[in-house]
Amino acid sequence: MNHLKTAILLAGLTALFMAVGFAIGGRGGMMIAFVVASATNLFSYWNSDKMVLRMYGAREVDETTAPDFVRMVHELARRADLPPPRVFIMDNPQPNAFATGRNPQNAAVAATTGLLQSLSPEEVAGVMAHELAHIKHYDTLTMTMTATIAGAISMLANFGLLFGGGNRNNNNPFGAIGTILMVILAPLAAMLVQMAISRSREYEADRGGAEILGRPMALASALAKISGAAHEVPNYEAESNPATAHMFIINPLSGARMDNLFSTHPAVENRIAALRALSQQMGGGGFAPGPAPAVRPPGGNPWGVDPGGGQRRGPWG
C-alpha cells in the first residue's frame, strides 16, 4: 500500500512539474519538463538520501566516534527487525532528527547535536525509534524523493519568473501574469501534495516508535521539548530548503515564513494525546525496553573530536 501511495504522490508531483513547464514554454516546455521530471525521479531514487544528508552537513559516526548513540540505534533496529542503519549527526543547535533511504537495507538516521545535548537518553531513544518506524514503513523513500522533486518544482517556478515572462505567445501561452501565478501556486501545490500523506504517517511512526521502545511517554516528552525549541532555535539549513521540512520529526521552520501556514506535521498536542492514550492501552507493557545509554555531562562534542584534533569522549561516546 505504501508503494502505491508513493507512486501516486510522485505522479502528482510529476504532473505539477509538467504544468510549470507548460506555463513557461508551452507544449515544448511541458515535454522538456516531463523528461526532466522522469530523470529527477530516477536520480532521486538512488541519490536523494545522499543529497539531503549533504545538504545538512551530516557526518557519519560509528561505534568508535559515538559508541553510546550508535549502539542505542542499532539495538532499537534489532528490536524492530531492521538491519542497522547508518548513523549521522548534524552540527545544529535545534533539537531535531530525520530518517532517509530508499529501503531498510540502505537507510540512515540523522540527529542534531541540539537533540543529543538537550534530551534525556530515553527521549533520544524515543526519537530514534520514531525514525526507525518510518524506515520500516518505507516512508523514507517517499519523504526524501518528495523533498527533492518539490525543491525542483520551486526552482523551475523561479526560473519561469525570471525568464518565462513577456507577451503571450506560442512558447509562453499564459503570458507574464500566468507565469507569475504559476510561480506562486506551484510550490504551494507541491506542499499540499506532501501534506496529503505525511501527516498520517507521523501518527503511524509515533505509534510504531512507541511500540519499538516500549515507552510511549518518552517519545511524548521528546516531542514536547523539540516543539518548544524549534520555535526558539532557528535551523537555517531548513529555512533555506523548506521542501525538506516534512522529513523531520518536528517541523524545523521557525514559523516566521509563509511555509509554516501549510505545516506537513500534525499538531504536537494531538500527537502527545495519541501517545498518552497508547501508553494507557499498553499499561506499562509493550516491548521490554532495554537500558538507556548513560549520558555524560553536556557541553562536549558528540563526535568525540576536540578543536585541537585530539580524541575525547563527548556526551554520546
UniProtKB/Swiss-Prot annotation:
Positions bound to Zn(2+): H130, H134, E202
Family per similarity comment: Belongs to the peptidase M48B family.
Top-tier EC class: hydrolase
Cofactor: Zn(2+)
Organism: Xanthobacter autotrophicus (strain ATCC BAA-1158 / Py2)
Localization per Swiss-Prot or TrEMBL: Cell inner membrane
Domain of life from the UniProt record: Bacteria
Cofactor note: Binds 1 zinc ion per subunit.
This protein's name: Protease HtpX homolog
Listed transmembrane segments: 6-26, 28-48, 145-165, 173-193
Main location as per UniProt: membrane
GO biological process: proteolysis
Gene: htpX
GO CC terms in record: plasma membrane
